[in-house]
Amino acid sequence: MTANRLVLTGTVCKALIRKVSPAGIPHCQFVIEHRSTQEEAGLKRQSWCRMPIIASGKALQTDTHSITVGSKVTVSGFISSHQARNGLFKLVLHAEQIELIDSGD
């Protein structure tokens, strides 16, 4: 098997969409926005991205119940390419673990 792992922390920036497949598998889709400072070649640089997330299966649905727009989360999983209705491809993070980060409030 070839490595395909991604761990990304970010803020939920689009409302969650819940669906159930014809096979009865629940899916939750949302988007997180990541912002950080990283070091590359000895220099600091700003890193930013928006990543669509798909959380499938009953176990992950429990993890997503308390997530809303503005929630800070760390998502671990694998990436895959999905074709949108307009024919364009986009990377999607398929969640295997979701951690809600306490804001401290």
Curated annotation (Swiss-Prot):
Family membership noted in the UniProt record: Belongs to the PriB family.
GO CC annotations on file: primosome complex
Underlying gene: priB
GO molecular function annotations of the record: single-stranded DNA binding
Keywords in alphabetical order: DNA replication, DNA-binding, Primosome
Subunit details: Homodimer. Interacts with PriA and DnaT. Component of the replication restart primosome. Primosome assembly occurs via a 'hand-off' mechanism. PriA binds to replication forks, subsequently PriB then DnaT bind; DnaT then displaces ssDNA to generate the helicase loading substrate.
Pfam families: SSB_1 (PF22657)
Transmembrane segments: none
Gene3D superfamilies hit by this protein: Nucleic acid-binding proteins
InterPro entries the record matches: NA-bd_OB-fold, Primosome_PriB/ssb, Prisomal_replication_PriB
Domain SSB, residue spans: 1-102
Superkingdom assignment: Bacteria
SUPFAM superfamilies in UniProt: Nucleic acid-binding proteins
Protein name according to UniProt: Replication restart protein PriB
Gene Ontology biological process terms from the UniProt entry: DNA replication, synthesis of primer
NCBIfam families, per the entry: PriB_gamma
Function: Involved in the restart of stalled replication forks, which reloads the replicative helicase on sites other than the origin of replication; the PriA-PriB pathway is the major replication restart pathway. During primosome assembly it facilitates complex formation between PriA and DnaT on DNA; stabilizes PriA on DNA. Stimulates the DNA unwinding activity of PriA helicase.
Upper taxonomic lineage: Bacteria, Pseudomonadati, Pseudomonadota, Gammaproteobacteria, Enterobacterales
